[in-house]
Amino acid sequence: MVILLRSGLLCHCQKPWGRVLPKEYLVGIDVGGTFTDILCLEVNSQKLLEAKVPSLPGRQWEGVLNALIELGINAEEISAFVHGTTIATNALLEKKGAKTALITTKGFRDTLEIGRTRRLTGGLFDIKFVRPGPLVERNLRIEVPERTSAYGTILNEIEDYDFVKLGSLLERSGVESVAVCFVNSYANAQNEKKAVSSLKKELELPVCYSAGIVPEQGEFHRFSSCVLNAYLTPVVRKYLSTLKIELQGRGVDSPVNIMGSNGGAMTLEQAGDFAVGTFLSGPVGGVGGAVRVCEMTDVKDSITFDMGGTSTDVALIHNRRPRISYDNQIDAFPLQVPQLDIHTIGAGGGSIAWVQEDGTLEVGPHSAGALPGPACYGRGGIQPTISDANLILGRLPIKRKLSGGLELNKGASEAAFAQLSKKLQGADITSLADGVLRIAVAKMAGAVREVSVHRGFDPRDFALLGFGGAGPMHVFLVAEELAVPTVIVPRYPGHLSAMGQLLADQRQDMVLSWGGRLENLSGGDLLSRIEVMEKESEALLSGNGFAVDRQMHEFSVDMRYTGQSFTLAVPIEKKKMTWDSLRRGFGERHEQTFGHQDSSNECEIVNLRLVSRGLVDKPVLTFSEKNDKNPIIESRKIWFDGAWVECSILDRELMAAESTFVGPAIIEEAGGTTVVPPKWKVSVHLSGTLFCENPFKKI
């Protein structure tokens, strides 16, 4: 294997991670659909090292090991290891989770099947729509005679139920995991906990309960979230166990943390118990890295644009805080756990261009993946992709090898597009490649609108931050489509997700179902309850090695107007909280989201929330020195706006801090290529981040 070992930016931090580090390296590894990226902070020299290797579907842990080998560091010298994985997502989408049983309250066996009145997939007008079935077969949905009232009173205890017989039945049925979901358990989980305790005495299987996953109102969403967790737990635990064994077998004895969907890191044990908290384990790292870029460059508001080989992920960052969603959907299943508000579409470098039945050109969502990959990879792929289109248009290098020693084959790309052209009445392949990019850009612009306009924000008030292996190639076109005034391209854009993982704080989310109309509540009661929550979370973080002065706790309340069925989260400060400030904050949030507020209506509190973080120190990335080197390494013709334009090719490592230039230009670096269209003005920040001004922005 050819070792790719490149060092660049220096990292200046007073003390790494806020703790004494006996060893040398901090490592972040992000597994994507096409590539596995690794970024490493070398503590002694404060340098960043990076590498990129192909992902291995079905063997993610092997890709992780290959990334470590490619980087060329000693495993024994790794002191912290954070990993983003797509194991949970893949298991659900491919329906390869565990055989799961549901133990529920008598009369609620079919809650998962009944669901809600709206379709979660398929579209409202799809006449061929077939509703996906629940993850638990009906014969494995077992009712028990228990009942708890909505106020938490135990109406029917569960002590007398025969769990020995139930355990024997589940064992004979080949069940691999169990979800215990009782009605109103959010108000009092006593019966659920007793059932879990009894089942664990009879079965050596994972058993989870709904109030332990989502202690909130709404049995359908709570049941669905718990069943998802049970369905995925054996798969996630098996992967994490294999990963730990393989890493230890190769000398890695440092703690291994997993990125959570909420944007923070968690221990292997936490990830094994809370599998549904890892659905966005990969994409959230990029958002975390983007937040760090914003902090270093004094940018308050940005929209992340993370384009890889398989998909594009976008998220909105307001006041350097990514938005959190508590009411989510994965595939056809509701998931009511906190995760970053990331919108994903099937448009990546490997997305396949194809012709629909009506003869129109389409791009994605199907992808060529890592194997065989785009035609230009020379690994047996024959279908035209977005990467092939970029190569045909001159945006990717032919002579220069990419990360991992990959050398692109333009002839293979042209052959793939020639076959596509035959289905479109012999269209010119250059124009066809340009059309493929335009279709992809339109879809990606729609994704940006989804997280901004649809949430009450104007994208023109934000910078567009492009990263991922393919993000910097397309982010400028998306910015022109939306009239976004500024594009930001960080250093190491292809490894920003790994950087976000490396720098991730440890995070814990807690929720308490408590509330009512404000006029009927006591402020002292609210404050006493959040004090209890804070002490519990403080103890958990202290147990994970974070001193009290390395912890941060933030509170919010879920509120709604009387008669509404949905809530909005309103931040609160313990020392400044009043009912008037809560009403005002909720009204402002409601108006921002929905365009109006109703000051005549009563407000209600539904939940209390706590977000706790164990803080790690963040390095400040800077160039070691300015230089007077010429970054231009060659020139070639690039297709822009319907014509071939002579364009300078720049080596990013040679670009001096505080230098400026005007496009067109191609900026090449390990792990990413930036395509700067004509007339865009580019400035190099001290951190190496590119600030690019849109000449076509609208006021």
Where do the model's predicted regions map?
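N-terminal glycine/serine-rich phosphate-binding loop of ATP-dependent small-molecule kinases
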Residues: 2-100, 149, 156-179, 192-210, ...
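C-terminal, non-catalytic interaction/recognition modules in large multi-subunit enzymes and RNPs
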Residues: 31, 161-165, 169, 299, ...
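Glycine-rich phosphate-binding loop of actin/hexokinase-like ATP-binding domains
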Residues: 38, 49-56, 101-107, 268, ...
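Gly-rich Lys/Arg/Thr-decorated short loops/hinges at beta-loop-alpha junctions or inter-strand turns
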Residues: 41-49, 122-125, 135-154, 175, ...
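Phosphate-binding loop and its immediate beta->loop->alpha context
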Residues: 48-72, 108, 132-166, 176-177, ...
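ATP-dependent carbohydrate kinase catalytic cores
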Residues: 61, 67-71, 211-218, 222-225, ...
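Active-site phosphate-binding/coordination module
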Residues: 98-152, 210-214, 500
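Terminal amphipathic helices with adjacent charged low-complexity linkers/tails
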Residues: 181-222, 612-625
